[in-house]
Amino acid sequence: CYAQREDDKCMLRLRMTAGSMPKDKLKFIVDSAKKYHISKIHFTTCQAVQLHNLGYKALTELAEAGYDHGIITRGTGGDNPRNTMCSPLSGVEKGEYFDVMPYAKAAGEYALTLIHQGKIPRKYKVVFSNSPKNASHATFHDIGFVARSDGKFDVYTSGGLGPNPRMGVLIDTAVDPKDICYYIYAQWKTFSEHGNCQNRGRARTRYLIELCGGEEEYKKVVYQNLADIRKREDLTIHIQPSAVTKTGDGTTIEGDRVIAQKQEGLYAIEWHTVGGCPQVDELEKLYETIKDFEDVEVRLGSYETAYIINLTASEAKKVLEATEDSAVVSEFEH
């Protein structure tokens, strides 16, 4: 959470790991906003949800209640691993290499275990990309896993925007997805050993290359940390792949905000509100529309856009109608 400029007002950031917001979490946000009269809700570029203008009592109660609904607020600000990001249409996007969402969620759980471990960067962003579109911008974050056509990942590290921006360094290719946590820890450990925490403006992994003496020396440090970690720990993850089994209703739909999924007959609807700040009544209208739809969930993207996925054509039409008044349609409004 963060203190706001106004006296006695705070913002609480809710992790939506990999941008996944199932219907029960959407309902929690709607119910909480009504209960505490929350005036501003914001979808962030890190695919999280921010609740603004909270009093101290509401802040503490919401943090505790969120945990009961599978929503983690710990480490969402400050010197911590931030919300793990992912291509928002992973698993349903036409042309994707493979569904990276399960790996992003596993990485998000693992990243939480790194809190308070050693000297840490001011932010640590773990990102997954599922297709050549690279919708999550995995190539310029602290560590990015970019899907390949062979079902493996290329790994980029020490990228970032802000002052002195830089693209990530391609640290390894054809990495087995079960090994992603080794790389997340190795990059974290590299910063712990070589990062600059004395200067807050430079306490980011994108400065590691120069601190290590150049790209090649930096790579050597990361590779050595990888080798050491593999000797000491077993960080292998085991994912049971799941597939969308829902089928279409025999009809089709087209439109500017309609995205045909790779599952025949199913669609996603894009919903971008002004500034990525939906009103409470707009969120409630969306929830009431989709609450009984099978296998439907909301995905948040890095442009503060929401996507409602796994809709039949008739369901998609209802979601379009429910979001018509609140959705922006021009590039300028985006």
Can you annotate each of these PLM segments?
Residues 1-334:
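Peripheral terminal and linker regions in Fe-S/redox and tRNA-modifying enzymes
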